[in-house]
A protein has these predicted regions:
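Glycine-rich phosphate-binding loops of nucleotide-dependent enzymes
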Residues: 1-241
Length: 241
């Protein structure tokens, strides 16, 4: 549960939400992306058109159209499709063609397939994932799969990417590579990153702002350095000195 929690995520920053298990971190994500419906409070978002929208009553698929995408703790790729096709599936919400167009393989469908295939190939190239273009997820290193999942979020032209424990299951080397990967995505694609993560090394090394919560309530918010030195956070989350 979340109790009277309020914060702002600024455009272009990497914002980290930390707290013990059960603190309400994933609940916050689920409320923003409309998997959960908040019983009180308001969630506002400055969308892809620069308009402030109220997310509380919005449907899940419309949240994506507004420019918000997310990943989950576990890799959610389609194992029967190669990496390129996994990216193309993620572009589905951007297609103008409908089921009938796809059924008859209309000119619009063909044109969109060319456009989005080029886009996917460009993303894979920009993020140094080209060697895996036609590979299938099964058998690939877990660190690569995490990167592919992040690359896939870019297919819908997001403004905000929400990452739920992106470093979960990664070793130290993979985590370091992922942190650089996240920063590269933020810089090259001009997106805002909002992440929940238990790996404090990753959080403190890449986040511009960190918000610490416990039992659904905000403990403190500030720069990584400020949070590391916060007595409230040390006592509630880090166990004090």
């Amino acid at each position: 549960a979340v109790d009277n929690l309020s914060f702002d995520v600024k455009k272009g920053e990497i914002f980290g939400l930390i707290g013990p298990n059960g603190a309400g971190k994933t609940t916050v994500f689920n409320c923003i992306t409309r998997f959960y419906k908040p019983t009180s409070g308001d969630i506002y978002f400055n969308n892809v058109n620069g308009k402030t929208v109220h997310l509380n009553e919005m449907k899940v698929h419309n949240v994506i159209k507004e420019g918000i995408v997310r990943t989950f703790q576990n890799v959610e790729l389609v194992w029967e499709l190669n990496i390129l096709d996994n990216l193309l599936v993620a572009a589905h919400s951007s297609y103008r063609s409908n089921f009938f167009h796809h059924l008859v393989h209309s000119r619009l469908t063909k044109r969109e397939e060319v456009i989005y295939t080029k886009k996917a190939m460009k993303i894979l190239n920009n993020l140094d994932l080209t060697p895996y273009t036609y590979a299938f997820p099964i058998g690939l290193p877990y660190g690569v799969l995490k990167k592919v999942e992040l690359a896939r979020t870019l297919m819908s032209n997001p403004k905000l990417i929400i990452l739920d424990e992106p470093a979960a299951g990664l070793n130290d080397t993979e985590t370091k590579e992922l942190s650089e990967f996240i920063k590269k995505i933020k810089d090259e694609y001009d997106v805002t990153i909002f992440l929940v993560e238990h790996d404090m090394g990753l959080v403190m090394s890449i986040c511009d702002t960190v918000c610490a919560i416990s039992f659904g309530k905000k403990l403190d918010i500030g720069t990584p350095k400020q949070i590391q030195s916060s007595k409230v956070v040390q006592e509630a989350y880090l166990g004090g000195e």
